[in-house]
Protein backbone atom coordinates (compact mmCIF):
# COMPACT_ATOMS: atom_id res chain seq x y z
CA UNK A 1 0.00 0.00 0.00
CA UNK A 2 1.22 3.48 -0.89
CA UNK A 3 1.28 5.49 2.36
CA UNK A 4 -0.06 8.97 1.64
CA UNK A 5 -0.10 12.14 3.74
CA UNK A 6 -2.36 15.08 2.96
CA UNK A 7 -1.31 18.63 3.84
CA UNK A 8 -4.11 21.15 4.50
CA UNK A 9 -6.33 18.22 5.39
CA UNK A 10 -9.01 20.29 7.13
CA UNK A 11 -9.67 22.48 4.07
CA UNK A 12 -12.09 21.87 1.22
CA UNK A 13 -9.51 20.36 -1.09
CA UNK A 14 -7.87 18.49 1.75
CA UNK A 15 -11.10 16.72 2.68
CA UNK A 16 -11.67 15.80 -0.95
CA UNK A 17 -8.14 14.40 -1.15
CA UNK A 18 -8.76 12.29 1.95
CA UNK A 19 -11.87 10.84 0.33
CA UNK A 20 -10.04 10.16 -2.93
CA UNK A 21 -7.18 8.39 -1.16
CA UNK A 22 -9.57 6.18 0.77
CA UNK A 23 -11.47 5.29 -2.41
CA UNK A 24 -8.37 4.28 -4.38
CA UNK A 25 -7.10 0.67 -4.30
CA UNK A 26 -3.43 0.53 -3.39
CA UNK A 27 -3.51 3.86 -1.56
CA UNK A 28 -4.02 4.56 2.11
CA UNK A 29 -4.17 7.73 4.19
CA UNK A 30 -1.59 7.40 6.94
CA UNK A 31 -1.10 11.06 7.91
CA UNK A 32 -3.09 14.29 7.76
CA UNK A 33 -1.68 17.69 8.60
CA UNK A 34 -3.11 21.19 8.97
CA UNK A 35 -2.17 24.58 10.41
CA UNK A 36 -0.79 24.63 13.97
CA UNK A 37 -3.55 27.05 15.00
CA UNK A 38 -6.36 24.87 13.64
CA UNK A 39 -9.04 24.05 16.19
CA UNK A 40 -9.47 20.68 14.47
CA UNK A 41 -6.02 19.31 15.35
CA UNK A 42 -6.51 15.92 16.97
CA UNK A 43 -9.74 15.18 15.11
CA UNK A 44 -10.09 11.99 13.08
CA UNK A 45 -9.31 12.74 9.42
CA UNK A 46 -12.01 10.37 8.21
CA UNK A 47 -14.66 12.15 10.24
CA UNK A 48 -13.49 15.51 8.85
CA UNK A 49 -14.14 14.14 5.36
CA UNK A 50 -17.50 12.65 6.42
CA UNK A 51 -16.19 9.11 5.92
CA UNK A 52 -16.38 7.93 9.52
CA UNK A 53 -13.44 7.13 11.77
CA UNK A 54 -10.32 5.81 10.03
CA UNK A 55 -7.87 6.11 12.92
CA UNK A 56 -5.73 8.88 11.42
CA UNK A 57 -5.66 11.97 13.62
CA UNK A 58 -5.08 15.47 12.27
CA UNK A 59 -1.57 16.64 13.16
CA UNK A 60 -0.21 20.18 13.34
CA UNK A 61 3.38 19.37 12.35
CA UNK A 62 4.80 17.41 9.42
CA UNK A 63 7.80 16.41 11.53
CA UNK A 64 5.55 14.55 13.97
CA UNK A 65 4.39 12.16 11.25
CA UNK A 66 7.64 11.89 9.28
CA UNK A 67 7.82 8.10 9.66
CA UNK A 68 4.19 7.52 8.71
CA UNK A 69 4.09 8.36 4.98
CA UNK A 70 5.87 7.82 1.67
CA UNK A 71 4.43 10.67 -0.36
CA UNK A 72 2.94 14.04 0.61
CA UNK A 73 0.09 15.60 -1.36
CA UNK A 74 0.16 19.39 -0.98
CA UNK A 75 -2.51 21.73 -2.37
CA UNK A 76 -1.92 24.71 -0.07
CA UNK A 77 -0.03 27.99 -0.51
CA UNK A 78 3.41 28.62 -2.04
CA UNK A 79 4.96 29.65 1.28
CA UNK A 80 3.65 26.50 2.98
CA UNK A 81 4.52 24.20 0.10
CA UNK A 82 8.11 25.45 -0.07
CA UNK A 83 8.62 24.70 3.64
CA UNK A 84 7.20 21.22 3.11
CA UNK A 85 9.40 20.81 0.04
CA UNK A 86 12.52 21.44 2.12
CA UNK A 87 11.33 18.91 4.70
CA UNK A 88 10.54 16.23 2.13
CA UNK A 89 13.83 16.80 0.34
CA UNK A 90 15.73 16.36 3.60
CA UNK A 91 13.84 13.21 4.57
CA UNK A 92 13.59 11.58 1.14
CA UNK A 93 9.81 11.85 0.77
CA UNK A 94 8.09 12.06 -2.61
CA UNK A 95 5.69 14.96 -3.25
CA UNK A 96 2.58 15.70 -5.26
CA UNK A 97 2.25 19.48 -5.60
CA UNK A 98 -1.00 21.04 -6.75
CA UNK A 99 -0.34 24.46 -5.22
CA UNK A 100 -0.56 27.37 -7.66
CA UNK A 101 0.75 30.94 -7.57
CA UNK A 102 4.49 30.19 -7.57
CA UNK A 103 6.88 32.81 -8.92
CA UNK A 104 9.45 31.91 -11.57
CA UNK A 105 12.12 31.80 -8.87
CA UNK A 106 10.01 29.54 -6.66
CA UNK A 107 9.41 27.14 -9.54
CA UNK A 108 13.17 26.89 -9.87
CA UNK A 109 13.31 25.67 -6.27
CA UNK A 110 10.94 22.86 -7.23
CA UNK A 111 13.23 21.92 -10.10
CA UNK A 112 16.24 21.88 -7.77
CA UNK A 113 14.44 19.63 -5.29
CA UNK A 114 13.60 17.28 -8.15
CA UNK A 115 17.27 16.37 -8.31
CA UNK A 116 16.91 14.63 -4.93
CA UNK A 117 13.30 13.42 -4.68
CA UNK A 118 10.55 12.46 -7.14
CA UNK A 119 7.94 15.22 -7.51
CA UNK A 120 4.83 15.59 -9.63
CA UNK A 121 3.99 19.28 -9.98
CA UNK A 122 0.99 20.34 -12.02
CA UNK A 123 -1.26 23.37 -12.14
CA UNK A 124 -4.17 20.98 -12.64
CA UNK A 125 -4.40 17.25 -11.94
CA UNK A 126 -7.57 16.67 -13.95
CA UNK A 127 -7.16 14.08 -16.70
CA UNK A 128 -9.42 16.18 -18.93
CA UNK A 129 -7.38 19.35 -18.48
CA UNK A 130 -4.15 17.54 -19.25
CA UNK A 131 -5.66 16.07 -22.40
CA UNK A 132 -6.75 19.63 -23.26
CA UNK A 133 -3.13 20.76 -22.99
CA UNK A 134 -2.20 18.22 -25.64
CA UNK A 135 -5.03 19.45 -27.87
CA UNK A 136 -3.95 23.07 -27.35
CA UNK A 137 -0.43 22.28 -28.48
CA UNK A 138 -1.80 20.64 -31.63
CA UNK A 139 -4.22 23.49 -32.35
CA UNK A 140 -1.59 26.19 -31.90
CA UNK A 141 0.85 24.46 -34.24
CA UNK A 142 -1.80 24.01 -36.95
CA UNK A 143 -3.38 27.46 -36.69
CA UNK A 144 -0.10 29.28 -36.16
CA UNK A 145 -0.10 33.06 -36.46
CA UNK A 146 -3.41 33.23 -38.34
CA UNK A 147 -5.58 33.50 -35.23
CA UNK A 148 -6.12 35.69 -32.18
CA UNK A 149 -5.78 33.70 -28.96
CA UNK A 150 -7.69 34.43 -25.76
CA UNK A 151 -7.88 32.42 -22.54
CA UNK A 152 -10.95 32.83 -20.33
CA UNK A 153 -11.15 31.23 -16.89
CA UNK A 154 -13.69 31.24 -14.07
CA UNK A 155 -13.39 30.07 -10.46
CA UNK A 156 -15.18 30.40 -7.13
CA UNK A 157 -15.10 33.64 -5.19
CA UNK A 158 -12.56 32.32 -2.66
CA UNK A 159 -9.71 31.67 -5.11
CA UNK A 160 -6.87 34.05 -4.25
CA UNK A 161 -4.65 33.97 -7.35
CA UNK A 162 -5.45 35.18 -10.87
CA UNK A 163 -5.18 34.13 -13.58
CA UNK A 164 -5.43 30.53 -12.43
CA UNK A 165 -2.39 28.31 -12.61
CA UNK A 166 -4.22 26.21 -15.18
CA UNK A 167 -4.89 29.23 -17.40
CA UNK A 168 -1.24 30.23 -17.21
CA UNK A 169 -0.16 26.70 -18.04
CA UNK A 170 -2.48 26.72 -21.04
CA UNK A 171 -0.90 29.99 -22.11
CA UNK A 172 2.58 28.52 -21.75
CA UNK A 173 1.67 25.51 -23.89
CA UNK A 174 0.24 27.71 -26.65
CA UNK A 175 3.12 30.19 -26.51
CA UNK A 176 5.74 27.45 -26.62
CA UNK A 177 4.03 25.84 -29.61
CA UNK A 178 4.21 29.18 -31.42
CA UNK A 179 7.78 29.95 -30.39
CA UNK A 180 6.75 32.85 -28.18
CA UNK A 181 7.67 33.85 -24.63
CA UNK A 182 4.46 34.06 -22.60
CA UNK A 183 5.91 36.69 -20.27
CA UNK A 184 6.44 38.95 -23.27
CA UNK A 185 3.12 38.40 -25.07
CA UNK A 186 0.57 37.94 -22.26
CA UNK A 187 -2.10 40.63 -21.83
CA UNK A 188 -4.03 40.47 -18.56
CA UNK A 189 -7.39 42.17 -19.01
CA UNK A 190 -8.16 45.22 -21.11
CA UNK A 191 -9.60 48.61 -20.26
CA UNK A 192 -10.06 51.94 -22.01
CA UNK A 193 -8.67 52.84 -25.43
CA UNK A 194 -6.49 49.81 -26.05
CA UNK A 195 -6.10 50.24 -29.80
CA UNK A 196 -6.14 47.43 -32.35
CA UNK A 197 -5.23 43.99 -31.11
CA UNK A 198 -1.69 42.72 -31.66
CA UNK A 199 -2.03 39.21 -33.07
CA UNK A 200 1.15 38.11 -31.33
CA UNK A 201 -0.40 38.64 -27.91
CA UNK A 202 -2.24 36.05 -25.81
CA UNK A 203 -5.07 37.55 -23.79
CA UNK A 204 -6.30 36.45 -20.36
CA UNK A 205 -9.69 37.17 -18.81
CA UNK A 206 -10.62 36.16 -15.27
CA UNK A 207 -13.97 35.62 -13.54
CA UNK A 208 -14.37 35.08 -9.79
CA UNK A 209 -17.92 34.26 -8.75
CA UNK A 210 -20.03 31.96 -6.61
CA UNK A 211 -18.95 28.35 -6.28
CA UNK A 212 -17.52 27.73 -9.76
CA UNK A 213 -15.07 24.84 -9.39
CA UNK A 214 -13.10 25.70 -12.52
CA UNK A 215 -13.91 26.59 -16.14
CA UNK A 216 -11.27 27.20 -18.81
CA UNK A 217 -11.72 28.12 -22.47
CA UNK A 218 -9.01 28.84 -25.01
CA UNK A 219 -10.33 30.72 -28.04
CA UNK A 220 -8.57 30.62 -31.41
CA UNK A 221 -10.34 33.28 -33.50
CA UNK A 222 -9.73 33.75 -37.23
CA UNK A 223 -11.61 35.60 -39.94
CA UNK A 224 -14.81 33.65 -40.56
CA UNK A 225 -14.37 30.94 -37.93
CA UNK A 226 -13.21 30.26 -34.41
CA UNK A 227 -12.16 27.21 -32.45
CA UNK A 228 -12.83 26.91 -28.72
CA UNK A 229 -11.29 24.27 -26.49
CA UNK A 230 -13.14 24.20 -23.17
CA UNK A 231 -12.84 22.23 -19.96
CA UNK A 232 -15.34 22.52 -17.10
CA UNK A 233 -14.85 20.90 -13.72
CA UNK A 234 -17.98 20.23 -11.67
CA UNK A 235 -16.26 18.68 -8.65
CA UNK A 236 -12.91 18.95 -6.86
CA UNK A 237 -12.86 15.17 -6.87
CA UNK A 238 -11.53 15.19 -10.43
CA UNK A 239 -8.39 16.99 -9.21
CA UNK A 240 -8.09 14.79 -6.13
CA UNK A 241 -8.32 11.53 -8.08
CA UNK A 242 -5.65 12.76 -10.47
CA UNK A 243 -3.37 13.63 -7.56
CA UNK A 244 -3.78 10.18 -6.01
CA UNK A 245 -3.16 8.59 -9.40
CA UNK A 246 0.07 10.58 -9.60
CA UNK A 247 1.05 9.48 -6.08
CA UNK A 248 0.73 5.82 -7.07
CA UNK A 249 2.58 6.44 -10.35
CA UNK A 250 5.54 7.97 -8.47
CA UNK A 251 6.21 4.74 -6.58
CA UNK A 252 9.69 3.58 -7.57
CA UNK A 253 10.40 6.55 -9.87
CA UNK A 254 13.80 8.18 -9.99
CA UNK A 255 14.18 11.70 -8.52
CA UNK A 256 12.95 14.27 -11.05
CA UNK A 257 10.37 17.00 -11.48
CA UNK A 258 7.50 15.35 -13.35
CA UNK A 259 4.08 16.64 -14.39
CA UNK A 260 0.74 15.07 -15.32
CA UNK A 261 1.77 14.78 -18.95
CA UNK A 262 4.34 12.25 -17.71
CA UNK A 263 1.83 10.45 -15.50
CA UNK A 264 -0.68 10.12 -18.35
CA UNK A 265 2.02 9.32 -20.94
CA UNK A 266 0.89 12.21 -23.15
CA UNK A 267 4.37 13.28 -24.24
Swiss-Prot record:
Primary localization: cytoplasm
A Pfam family: DapB_N
Active site: 155 (proton donor/acceptor), 159 (proton donor)
Keyword NADP: yes
GO cellular component: cytosol
Residue sites binding NADP(+) per the record: 35
GO molecular function: 4-hydroxy-tetrahydrodipicolinate reductase; NAD binding; NADP binding; oxidoreductase activity, acting on CH or CH2 groups, NAD or NADP as acceptor
Family per similarity comment: Belongs to the DapB family.
Gene behind this protein: dapB
Protein's name according to its UniProt entry: 4-hydroxy-tetrahydrodipicolinate reductase
Binding-site residues, (S)-2,3,4,5-tetrahydrodipicolinate: 156, 165-166
Superkingdom of source: Bacteria
Enzyme Commission number(s): 1.17.1.8
Amino acid sequence: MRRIAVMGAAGRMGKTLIEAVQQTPGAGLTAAIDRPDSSLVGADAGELAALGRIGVLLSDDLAKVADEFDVLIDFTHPSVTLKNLAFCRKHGKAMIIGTTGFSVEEKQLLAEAGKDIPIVFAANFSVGVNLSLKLLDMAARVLGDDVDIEIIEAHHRHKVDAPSGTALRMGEVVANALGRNLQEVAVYGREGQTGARDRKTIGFATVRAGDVVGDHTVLFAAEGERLEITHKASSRMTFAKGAVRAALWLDGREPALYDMQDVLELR
